[in-house]
Design a protein with these regions (language model features):
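Short aromatic/hydrophobic contact patches that present stacked aromatics
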Residues: 39-41, 119, 207
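Conserved SAM/SAH cofactor-binding pocket of Class I
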Residues: 118-202
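A short, charged helix-loop
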Residues: 110-116
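Surface-exposed loop/turn positions
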Residues: 93-95, 142, 230
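N-terminal auxiliary segments of SAM/dcSAM-dependent transferases
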Residues: 2-106
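A short hydrophobic/small-residue beta-strand
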Residues: 7, 165, 232-233
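S-adenosylmethionine
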Residues: 171-271
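Short beta-strand micro-motifs in enzyme catalytic cores
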Residues: 38-40, 110, 265-267
Length: 272
């Protein structure tokens, strides 16, 4: 960016191959590093001197021999283009995620109105889908906690599915802002808090769709937040991580057989 780029991103050059490296980070806790082989994409002014930029980059980084390609990006209606990439998502025939610019496919369903935005959770990711499908199967929900609420999608779904009282917490202040905005758009009354201000009450259901590393550390907190006989649902877990998570939570929960979707896992259980 210091060399004049309008925007820049770094991606794993081995993404979607066997050599792909999974690196995650949380707000305030950045990932430990970047990948061994990277693709850097920069957006530049149309008249930018790419050769001079690469020369400066080599001087700054002491790395030489960059291979590169350029592409001219034509002016478009970027809002319309972005909107065209998001369609209503069917979780079950009776539960849909619908962007604001779309009509709900069926008015008889529970429709969660949600646009892509500041925080994770639009319904398209397998972990979100797993949690939403599980929530839709719960016959009775009184008090529900969404720990690591992101966009608030799980909390909003719980409320629309009939939960009496729903609370959401997140470490990221932007997620709390996004959740409150989305709840207002869906006309549901939900309390969202920064996790530092969260009062550790007990709930009938605790759902957490966050990174597995965070789930490992937060196991005592999540267990304390769930009443005896209550249920937990955890996701954000890769299939290779499910045994370690199940073992960690078995101290407090009778853990069910994991549910797997596209390499991601939903771990559920009942509080002992």
């Amino acid at each position: 960016m210091a060399l004049g780029a309008l925007s820049a991103s770094i991606e794993d050059a081995n993404a979607e191959t066997q050599a792909e490296q999974a690196i995650f980070g949380e707000p305030g806790d950045p990932p430990p590093g970047i990948w061994h082989h990277n693709v850097v994409t920069a957006m530049l002014e149309a008249n930018a001197d790419v050769v001079q930029l690469l020369t400066s980059l080599e001087q700054e980084t002491k790395i030489t021999g960059f291979s590169y390609s350029t592409e001219i990006i034509e002016e478009q209606d970027w809002v319309r283009l972005t909107q065209s990439q998001f369609e209503p998502i069917e979780i079950t025939p009776k539960l849909w995620i619908v962007p604001t610019w779309h009509e709900a496919p069926t008015q008889d369903a529970i429709n969660i109105i949600l646009d892509p935005g500041l925080a994770f959770g639009t319904g398209s990711h397998p972990t979100t889908h797993l949690c939403l499908a599980w929530l839709s199967q719960q016959s009775a929900m009184h008090r529900v906690l969404d720990y690591g609420c992101g966009s608030g999608i799980l909390a909003i779904a719980a409320k629309k599915l009939g939960a009496t009282e729903v609370t959401g917490v997140d470490i990221d202040p932007q997620a709390v802002i996004a959740s409150r905005y989305n709840a207002e758009n869906n006309q549901v009354d939900i309390q969202f808090y920064d996790s530092n201000a969260y009062l550790h009450e007990t709930y009938d259901i605790v759902v957490a769709n966050i990174l597995s590393s965070a789930l490992m550390v937060l196991a005592p907190v999540i267990a304390k937040s769930c009443k005896t006989g209550g249920k937990m649902a955890l996701s954000g877990i890769l299939e290779t991580q499910k045994e370690a998570l199940a073992q960690q939570y078995s101290e407090w929960f009778d853990v069910d057989t994991p549910v797997v979707k596209d390499g991601w896992v939903l771990l559920t259980g009942t509080k002992k």
